[in-house]
């Protein structure tokens, strides 16, 4: 097969047989986000590379190994977004959205890009639902952002997930933690990978996020960040847990969670499952109080999360959660002959204006082929129009499920009457086809 007819390695097509699942999930997410007061934001798929270097962190795997970076003809370095938080923060800062009042609540559906080995439920192009909250330092804000994620899983019927919670402190108390980490890992310098050796001086906490099996094993006995929290961070974390307890959102404390991005401070969390193997983190996020300031703005306490759509869908399938099929065709109107086809085309247009689904022949099929097609697309009713039907102003209406046929008037009054009764038929499921006359 020619390369031009093959999708790029690490990317997937979402075909009509699956896209309806995405649409339904996205609709639920939009609805719940709106209930929490969040509004949609859309940002470019590429940004200045420096945005991610400063925001995500130049010692992270994401920036060092995984970004798609290129130079424009003018020599400007740009990168495809590897995550959504940095671009959303840049947009809020650039457009001074905070002038509209705080807090600012945004959500987005982003395609993101990371150059990494393709694995099950891990792709080079992947999709995220993200929610970001700016201008709130209260532990209640942490609980609200976590509550939104938990509510989404609830609405979708996903149950086999564990909320894991940690605090990685603020820059002040984390400085002491970094010293402890550095001292610990220096005892294993001969075993650390080259990347982690470079991190030892710049940001030893990133070693905890290393994917190397050797480094991961060493990190198991590393100092725990919770032991180094300052009083303010301890109190903040305690209050976050109190809010979650009050809302009856179950969680466990996992002191090993540090997240793979440098902008995080204080609360970090993940929703994980054992059903997806090594790619078990379906949603992750936390607080990033210094990000807006790092990008040149004023100090703006912020937090958010990203939820992987591919992993969510894989988990729903693994759990056997059935996503309802999209509505099928309500009526197929077949036309035989040029005049009848024009009449069918006109009637279909009128039917569609009632917000129901209607189709007619647009490829020149025979009547038999049209009926076969109507059955294939799951049409609930069909109607056949030919020369005789036009002359007599009558047509045959067929219930495709029962096979019952009824002769009905072929005029605008029929169309109105039909869809009035048909709407009742859809709701009750008991209407008799004769009621349409």
What spans do the regions from the language model cover?
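TRNA-recognition modules of translation machinery and tRNA-sensing kinases, especially anticodon-binding
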Residues: 1-437
């Amino acid at each position: 097969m020619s390369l031009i007819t093959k999708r790029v390695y690490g990317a997937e097509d979402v075909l009509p047989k699956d896209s309806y699942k995405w649409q339904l999930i996205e609709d639920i997410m939009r609805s719940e986000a709106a209930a929490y007061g969040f509004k949609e934001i859309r940002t470019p798929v590429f940004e200045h590379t420096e945005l991610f270097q400063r925001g995500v962190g130049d010692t992270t795997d994401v920036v060092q190994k995984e970004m798609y970076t290129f130079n424009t003809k003018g020599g400007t370095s740009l990168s495809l977004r590897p995550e959504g938080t940095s671009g959303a923060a840049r947009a809020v800062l650039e457009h001074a959205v905070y002038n509209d009042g705080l807090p600012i609540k945004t959500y987005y559906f982003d395609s993101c890009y990371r150059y990494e080995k393709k694995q099950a439920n891990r792709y080079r192009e992947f999709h995220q639902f993200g929610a970001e909250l700016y201008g709130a330092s209260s532990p209640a804000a942490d609980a609200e952002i976590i509550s939104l994620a938990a509510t989404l899983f609830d609405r979708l019927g996903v149950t086999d997930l564990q909320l894991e919670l940690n605090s990685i402190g603020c820059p002040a108390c984390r400085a002491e933690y970094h010293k402890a980490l550095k001292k610990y890992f220096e005892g294993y310098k001969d075993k650390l990978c080259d990347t982690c050796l470079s991190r030892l001086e710049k940001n030893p906490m990133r070693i905890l996020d290393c994917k190397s099996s050797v480094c991961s094993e060493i990190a198991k006995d590393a100092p725990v960040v919770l032991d180094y929290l300052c009083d303010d961070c301890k109190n903040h974390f305690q209050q976050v847990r109190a809010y979650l307890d009050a809302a009856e959102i179950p969680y466990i404390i996992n002191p090993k969670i540090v997240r793979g991005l440098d902008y995080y401070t204080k609360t970090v969390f993940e929703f994980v499952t054992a059903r997806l193997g090594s790619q078990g983190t379906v949603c992750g996020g936390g607080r990033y109080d210094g990000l807006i300031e790092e990008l040149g703005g004023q100090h703006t306490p912020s937090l958010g999360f990203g939820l992987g759509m591919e992993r969510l869908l894989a988990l729903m399938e693994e759990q056997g959660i059935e996503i309802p099929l999209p509505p099928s065709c309500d009526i197929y109107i077949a036309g035989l002959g040029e005049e009848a086809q024009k009449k069918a085309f006109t009637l279909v247009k009128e039917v569609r204006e009632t917000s129901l689904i209607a189709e007619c022949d647009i490829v020149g099929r025979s009547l038999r082929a049209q009926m076969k097609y109507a059955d294939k697309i799951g049409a609930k009713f069909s109607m056949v129009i030919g020369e005789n039907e036009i002359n007599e102003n009558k047509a045959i209406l067929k219930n495709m499920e029962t096979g019952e046929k009824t002769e009905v008037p072929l005029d605008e009054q029929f169309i109105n009457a039909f869809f009035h009764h048909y709407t009742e038929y859809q709701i009750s499921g008991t209407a008799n086809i004769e009621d349409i006359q």
